[in-house]
Amino acid sequence: MAARAAVTSLTVPTPTRPAPLQVREIDEATHREHLAARASASFLQTPGWGRVKAEWRRESVGFFDGESLVGVALVLYRQLPKVKRFLAYVPEGPVLDWGEVDLASALPALAAHVKARGAFGIRIGPPVVTARWSAQQVKDGIADDDVRRLGDLAPTERDTAGARVVTQLRELGWRPQVAEGGFAAGQPQFVFQVPLRDADGTALDEDAVLKGMNQLWRRNIKKADKLGVEVTASEGREEALARLEDFHDLYVHTAERDHFTPRPLSYFRV
């Protein structure tokens, strides 16, 4: 289990001095190429996610050090009712080298850019880890009546780089969103990660991955296997779209059973 930096927001200020880094609009091809060159990035920062969020206006922007592209962001703009003012939102981003980039340069440049686009405020979701808990520790905490929330457990690991980012964001005037039940106004603050590699980087086989799960998870996976549940990859967009209705039907039944509001089929067609 990992805790990430909370979604943070800022009322867009008027810049007092030019930022060394420059932010400007880029095309989707440049955006995708930059993401492909990185070790990892959230799908919420891909141009395709902007097309999914059709009710928001989308923009791909790049962070430039001179003419060198050092980071990108998908910015979503949501207009306030009856006025031409927008909230800018960067889900799971921006995509930067958070441990290396000068945030005092990059973030004011981003704020200035969205302000010029009519935004009154901006919300970002720094993809940095601040703390980790082991699966066993979480399991023990669930069984302990004195543990009411994950924060009551001392983490097995604290990430100094993530903590440094959080501190710098506060110093720059960014404010964390209040999380309720592990969720803030944006993406989950706490995420469970299943390791697929050992500490030394060796890939784990299926048995080793299952061993890291609790008994209930292992039982459910074995039950699905016995019932003939199969996972298949679609060959191309047309085949995927043809199977989408079957998925959506199952999804709607799940929503009815678990009492949550399902997305329409159109939401999954990008």
Label the model's feature ranges.
Residues R51-D152:
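Conserved donor-binding loop and adjoining core beta-sheet/short helix segment
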Residues A112-F120, R164-P176:
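Structural alpha-beta junctions
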Residues P15-R17, Y89:
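Short glycine-enriched loop/turn motifs at secondary-structure junctions
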Residues P13-T14, Q79:
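Short boundary motifs at domain starts and secondary-structure transition points
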Residues V101-L110, R158-L169:
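Well-ordered, non-membrane alpha-helical segments in soluble/globular domains
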Residues M1-V12:
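Short, intrinsically disordered terminal tails adjacent to the first/last structured region
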Residues P20-V83, V128-A131, E157, A161-G162, ...:
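A conserved beta-strand-loop-helix scaffold within acyl/acetyltransferase catalytic domains
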